[in-house]
């Protein structure tokens, strides 16, 4: 019920604290299945100071718009492109929808179809429904990467583009993006790479010597990439990113908003009003940590993943779904539903997929948290 009179700030705050006591918190060490993390303290400071900035009305916040452009350029550089075109958006879902919309609008096909792996994120289902694009699902190989031959067999005159995943939601698998890029070039189709998770992991992991295939704009067939700074980038939610290789993709989805300050403003994002502070936080975190800072974060996460995978193998009745590629470790057990329910009853925030449990080594996850989890897991599995 909407209150007749207001309430003291402290009283309201105390009520909020009471109502959210059921929430798991990142600092508890219990959240092991999330692809998000507690934001970096510096990013929180940026959000607080610039909370009023609205990138949906860039004529009012000209400086913030320029900073967003610089953030997009830095993300483009990270992804192998000197200058890209895009925006800091609400997350991977919006970014993926924008990519599909750009492909559809440029293709001009009456019955558009998009080919994507069966491992693709559910945001593409939303995109298909919203944009009237039929989704054509490609089969996976035994290692859970997309079957490139099956992708090729599904190409028709109605195909508007192809999707590859660089860090699948369930297993952290990276598709054979080089092969998909070659295929896209052969057929004159654009390739979108969903690197919502892998975008802030793979460049640094490769620099550390991990054997991961190329996935970004270094491959000529890649025309757009989704990358989420609010995951391993440690920027507060919401902060996703969509980067296009060429301006024509942004132009294809831009709508004129003539009444905004500054006059003829073109908007390409789904949201009108957009939090400028989050885009500024993306810029600030990249400036603050740099490549070496993020490489150190990824080093710890990858080493923790390798250690954790090894410890899982020591527990009878527990098995890896596959060796980890990124900082995601997924495993199965007998009586998985019972194990999952008991782990959750003990307070663990885990992500259960079809047939396995996913653990994500985000920056807030420490070895002592995992050691406690392993003790609980072994106890539950042994009955």
UniProtKB/Swiss-Prot annotation:
Record's catalysed reaction(s): L-aspartate + H(+) = beta-alanine + CO2
E.C. designation(s): 4.1.1.11
Record InterPro entries: GrpII_AminoAcid_Decarb (IPR050477), MfnA (IPR020931), PyrdxlP-dep_de-COase (IPR002129), PyrdxlP-dep_Trfase (IPR015424), PyrdxlP-dep_Trfase_major (IPR015421), PyrdxlP-dep_Trfase_small (IPR015422), Pyridoxal-P_BS (IPR021115)
Pathway in which this enzyme or protein is active: Cofactor biosynthesis; coenzyme A biosynthesis
Cofactor requirement: pyridoxal 5'-phosphate
Enzyme class: lyase
KW Lyase (keyword) present: yes
Official protein name in the record: Probable L-aspartate decarboxylase
Record organism: Thermococcus gammatolerans (strain DSM 15229 / JCM 11827 / EJ3)
Organism phylogeny: Archaea, Methanobacteriati, Methanobacteriota, Thermococci, Thermococcales
């Amino acid at each position: 019920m909407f209150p007749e009179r207001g309430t003291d700030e402290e009283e309201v705050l105390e009520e909020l604290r009471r109502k959210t006591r059921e929430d798991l918190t990142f600092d508890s060490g219990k959240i092991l299945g999330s692809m998000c993390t507690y934001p970096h303290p510096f990013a929180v400071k940026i959000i607080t100071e610039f909370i009023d900035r609205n990138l949906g009305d860039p004529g009012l916040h000209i400086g913030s718009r320029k900073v967003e452009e610089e953030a997009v350029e830095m993300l483009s550089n990270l992804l192998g492109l000197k200058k890209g075109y895009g925006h800091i958006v609400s997350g991977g879902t919006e970014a993926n929808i924008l990519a599909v919309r750009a492909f559809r609008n440029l293709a001009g096909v009456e019955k558009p179809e998009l080919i994507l792996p069966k491992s693709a994120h559910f945001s593409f289902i939303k995109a298909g429904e919203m944009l009237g694009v039929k989704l054509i699902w490609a089969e996976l190989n035994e290692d859970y990467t997309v079957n490139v031959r099956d992708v090729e067999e599904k190409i028709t005159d109605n195909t508007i583009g192809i999707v590859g995943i660089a860090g699948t939601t369930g297993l952290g698998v990276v598709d054979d993006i080089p092969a998909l890029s070659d295929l896209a070039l052969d057929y004159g189709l654009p390739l979108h790479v969903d690197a919502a998770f892998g975008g802030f992991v793979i460049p640094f992991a490769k620099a550390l010597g991990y054997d991961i295939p190329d996935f970004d704009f270094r491959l000529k067939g890649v025309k757009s990439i989704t990358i989420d700074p609010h995951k391993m980038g440690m920027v507060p939610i919401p902060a996703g990113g969509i980067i296009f290789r060429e301006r024509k993709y942004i132009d294809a989805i831009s709508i004129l908003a003539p009444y905004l300050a500054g006059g003829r403003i073109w908007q390409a994002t789904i949201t009108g009003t957009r939090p400028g502070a989050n885009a500024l936080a993306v810029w600030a975190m990249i400036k603050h940590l740099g490549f070496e800072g993020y490489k150190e974060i990824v080093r710890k996460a990858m080493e923790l993943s390798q250690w954790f995978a090894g410890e899982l193998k020591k527990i009878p009745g527990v098995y890896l779904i596959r060796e980890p590629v990124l900082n995601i470790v997924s495993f199965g057990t007998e009586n998985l539903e019972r194990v999952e329910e008991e782990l959750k009853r003990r307070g663990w925030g885990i992500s259960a997929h079809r047939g396995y449990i996913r653990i994500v080594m985000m920056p807030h996850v420490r070895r002592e948290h995992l050691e406690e989890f392993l003790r609980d897991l072994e106890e539950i599995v042994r009955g």
